[in-house]
Amino acid sequence: MSRGRVGKAGGLKGQWPHYVVAGCMPWNRRVFHEVIEKLPGRWDFIESPEELNVKTIQSMHPRYIFFLHWSWKVPDKLVSAHECVCFHMTDVPYGRGGSPLQNLIVRGVRHSKLTALRMTSDIDSGPVYLKRNLCLEGCAEEIYIRATYLAAAMIEQIIRDQPKPTAQKGKGVIFRRRTGRESKIVRPKSLGMLYDFIRMLDAEGYPRAFIDHSGFHFEFSRAALHEGEIRADVTITCLEKTKS
């Protein structure tokens, strides 16, 4: 657990409001130190499920727990006992569920919303605090970094205004979490669709777009779409080594 700076008290009868930020990606920690921990209050950063200990969190009495990017289930006891806020890359109720960025891009979506919502026992179904426009251009890692800075600005507004979240309206559309096998390139219909497929998987911790051919495994990253061609970095390994 990383202890952040202590900012201004925010007028809560002389006490420092306590906030916890959880994030499992390196850019989450970077934005926490660059931006979030400088906001008013006492701040702690958590990056592993072991640190998200119910007893430890309860002893902190946090006003909010913010989840920037989290790959594990949050204990129901923690969600029910504290105001937990997650940031989801869709205009909910559309796009609840897993792999939102990849599911949006593969559907041809170029602009979405970053939604701050209260976590409940039903995934991505809780009431909404804020929505902000989010551009989905660039590679996946660039988009995740962009979204994290946007989330930091939304956190600032939430702790300042303490808005009451409002229930989602409309019919829910559920996204299924993608698997590593689905990163295989299979007959894209156009050069643009191939470019989108490569870039949507190009982030640390994600299985990159690949093809297997003639005993070799080809992984693609850093794609750029030019007129009539794609230029990309390719990492080639022996297929036997990849499978082992």
Please report, for each region that a protein language model flagged, where it lies by residue.
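One-carbon transfer enzymes
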Residues: 1-244
